[in-house]
Structure formats: C-alpha cells, structure tokens
C-alpha cells in the first residue's frame, strides 16, 4: 500500500514496524458538544483506512482516546476549558456532559457505519500513566516546573517543527484577545504537561500529583494512552489536519523524548470540511450534525457517500445541493444492486480484474473516489449477478455503504415468492397478448410498491424506497 505521510509530506510505501500487524491511534473527540459533520468526515476516512488495512490482510489494533479533561479552546494551552464550558452551558457536571456526548458521538458513528475502535480510553482513566510519563520527562531534563505548572521544554529538541511550514507565530491561532500569555514558559512553543495553577476557579476534575493537585494538559493524554495500549512503536497516527500543529507536533516531542527513539512512522491527516462561511467549526455557533441531516430526510450513509466521493487530502465543500446529488446517486446505486439475482456461485476468476481495480484504487493513498468507480465497473461488467454481488459485498467491507442490504432484505422477505409468482403470471399473460390480465397484475404490483423493469437481461424488480 502507498500512503501519504504528513511527516515528510510525501507518498510512501506502507511498511509497519511488525510485519502483518498495524498499530493505529486516532485522536478522539473532546466530549463537550455534539460532533459536527466536519469532525465526522475525519472519522469516516479513518474508518475506511482501518477497514482497507484489514481487507488487505493486516491484523489491525486501533486505539482512540476520549478527551474528557484538559482540552482548552485554543490548542496551545490558552482559552477556555471546553469541558467546563459545556458543563456551564447545560448546568450539569463535567462527567455528566462527558457521558452524554460520548454516547452521542458513538451513536453518530453507528449511523455512519464507523466501526468502534478496538480500544476506547477516556483520559480520566489514565491519570497514573500521565503522571508517570511527566515524571520521566522531568528526570530526563525535557520538562520544568514554573508557576506551579509542569511544562515541556521545546528548546531541548533539535527540531520541534517536524511538520514543516509552521513556526511560533502559528501558536497564536485561535487565542482570544482577552487571554493573557503564559509568562511561566521559557519558550513560546513550550506547552503544559500538568496544570496545578488552573485559570478556572471552578475546575471540577483534579487529582493528586507530585507537583500538587491539578489535571493533565491535553497533549500528554494521547501520547500516554497510545503508549499504554500500542506500546513503544506506533505505525499510523490519525487526525484532522488542524491537529497537526501544535497537538501532533507536541505528541511527537514528548513521546520521543520519553521513549528515547522514533515513535510513529506514518501520520494520516484529513483535510477540512468547509461550508459557505469557510471551515466548519463549533466556535461559529451553529453547525451541522448527523441528527440535523436526518431531520431533513437524509440517510446518514448518503453523507458517508458524499465524503467518499472526494479524496481525504482535499478540502471538501458541503452544500445541500451536493448532498442531494449524493442522495440521488446512492438511491440509484442501491436500486441497481437490489435487482441483481443471488442465484448461483460467483466466478472467482472473472472477479479478479475487478478486485485488482479496487485494490489499485484504495491501495494508492486511499483513493475512495476510484474505489466507488470500481463498484460501477462491476455493475456494468459482463459477469454473472452472483459474481457482481460477491464483489460488491467485498468492496463494501471497506466502503460500508450497506450496498447489498436492500438485496439481502429482498431475498429474506416472504412476500418475494408472491412477487415472483405475479411477475411470472404477467410474463405469461403478455406472451399470450392477454393485456387486461397483464395490466391488472401490473397494478397489483404497483400497490405492493414493486417496480418492474424489462431489461435485455430479463425482468428485474425491486421495492420502492
């Protein structure tokens, strides 16, 4: 497989640390509000990556954190505490907010056919791991205590800005004018590992530590949770492009300082979803959720298809017109597949060129658009219906669009025997030029919401959606 690596900004052959096994880590949600569909685009594409790696024969372990403490509204240790902000907004405790929005996130994932990671770890479960990692960084001289907080010292590194095109001026992005700069830092790029002097008097979640009662910084969470579950070597780290700096930059800094060797080989970043106002963001107030799309009559899998129609390394612009186009394409695709007959066995030799086409697409930096083209190639191909259904079922292990579900439901529906009998009677009536009987049967089928199509390959039928 060829995969674009943000660390180096080139396409590279994917070679995991241990042959046949892939350790994967995903930056999970900060659970202070609903995920918007821009957030979910990232998780959809990460889901496709995981499923394609499994499809390609790898044994994949995917770990994801849940940030339920420590994430401030600027990724650079400034601004409001997001969890505290959510709790105040809804007059609930931080843990009540965290549970509600964690459940809501996974409900959205379920609707979008996003597989739950093998390990899901809330940050609040790992305080001991955070304290241990910070202690080691202090012992090694990579961290210092100032003003009651523990900071990572970026001046100890030969190269802090590992993703390129970044500098300390970028740390100001997202910081509100009313937020004072942290004068305890020795260098502007330094970041907090542990807060004991919280700027928030009402901070709910605090723990004992060697440096006083406090709570972890956001960046230490992902490093410690990944090391806890994936060990010292990580193959792929995933996230949105806005996580690359400073969050992922800080993860690399502290993880490699702690471990004493290179940590993660490949960095997979998904670009933004934009709307008419620019990048979709919760900070703008109103934002689109899966539930909102459902309330407008859209199947969540239409949004998944919309995402798969574009490459993950390209910004994607959302509009209802483009979603409508995806809905039309999805409806036509499902109807076409539902007309295929499952009778017979697939021809595995005939299937090979189509499998190769799909692998060539997904294996080249996860080109989901060409992967969808492979589905249409199958439908147009001069192969049996059984072979087509086999191939589409295989592809859908990665695409996860429920492409064969309507056909499977049709096969399991007892009413199908009646439909098949009526169609046979209609065919016989037409052969005998008994148009009255043929029309009567057609009307009955219409009442049953059955659509009949006369094609060159014979009669095809499906239920109306």
Predicted regions and their residues:
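Alpha-helical recognition segments enriched in aromatics with Gly/Pro capping
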Residues: 1-32, 47, 107, 127-339
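Surface-exposed helix-capping loop/turn segments at secondary-structure junctions
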Residues: 57-60, 111-118, 143-144, 233, ...
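Structural preference for alpha-helix termini/caps and helix-kink/transition segments
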Residues: 279-282, 286-465
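Non-catalytic interaction-recognition regions
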Residues: 92-96, 106-132, 142, 244, ...
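Anion (oxyanion) recognition and catalysis
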Residues: 54, 138, 446
């Amino acid at each position: 497989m060829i995969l674009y690596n943000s660390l180096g900004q080139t396409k590279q052959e994917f070679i995991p640390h241990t042959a046949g096994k892939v350790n994967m880590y995903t930056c999970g949600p900060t659970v202070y509000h609903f995920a918007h569909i821009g957030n979910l685009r990232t998780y959809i594409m990460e889901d496709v990556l995981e499923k394609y790696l499994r499809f390609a024969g790898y044994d994949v372990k995917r770990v994801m954190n849940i940030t339920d403490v420590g994430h401030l509204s600027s990724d650079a240790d400034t601004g409001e505490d997001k969890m505290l902000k959510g709790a105040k907004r809804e007059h609930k405790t931080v843990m009540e907010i965290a549970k509600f929005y964690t459940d809501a996130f996974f409900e959205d994932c379920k609707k979008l056919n996003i597989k739950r990671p093998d390990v899901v770890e809330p940050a609040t479960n790992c305080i001991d791991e955070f304290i241990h990692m910070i202690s080691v960084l202090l012992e090694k001289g990579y961290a210092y205590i100032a003003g009651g907080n523990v900071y990572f010292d970026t001046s100890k590194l030969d190269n802090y800005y590992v993703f390129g095109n970044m500098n300390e001026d970028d740390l100001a992005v997202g910081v509100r004018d009313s937020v004072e700069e942290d004068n305890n830092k020795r260098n502007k790029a330094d970041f907090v590992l542990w807060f004991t002097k919280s700027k928030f008097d009402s901070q709910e979640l605090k723990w004992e530590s060697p440096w006083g009662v406090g709570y972890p910084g956001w960046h230490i969470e992902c490093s410690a949770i990944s090391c806890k579950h994936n060990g010292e070597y990580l193959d792929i780290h995933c996230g949105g492009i806005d996580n690359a700096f400073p969050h992922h930059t800080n993860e690399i800094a502290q993880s490699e300082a702690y471990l004493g060797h290179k940590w993660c080989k490949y960095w997979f970043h998904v670009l933004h979803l934009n709307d008419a106002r620019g990048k979709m963001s919760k900070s703008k107030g109103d934002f689109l959720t899966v539930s909102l799309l459902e309330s407008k009559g859209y199947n969540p899998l239409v949004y998944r298809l919309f995402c798969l129609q574009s490459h993950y390394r390209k910004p994607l612009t959302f509009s209802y017109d483009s979603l409508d186009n995806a809905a039309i394409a999805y409806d036509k695709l499902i109807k076409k597949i539902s007309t295929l007959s499952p009778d017979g066995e697939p021809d595995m030799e005939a299937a090979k060129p189509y499998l190769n086409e799909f692998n060539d697409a997904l294996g080249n930096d996860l080109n989901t658009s060409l992967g969808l083209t492979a589905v249409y190639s199958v439908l147009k191909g001069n192969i049996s219906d059984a072979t087509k259904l086999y191939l589409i079922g295989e592809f859908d292990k990665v695409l996860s669009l429920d492409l064969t579900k309507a056909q499977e439901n049709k096969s399991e529906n007892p009413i199908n025997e009646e439909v098949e009998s009526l169609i046979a009677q209609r065919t016989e009536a037409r052969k005998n030029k008994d148009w009255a009987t043929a029309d009567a049967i057609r009307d009955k089928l219409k009442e049953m919401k059955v659509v009949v199509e006369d094609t060159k390959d014979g009669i095809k039928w499906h239920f109306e959606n």
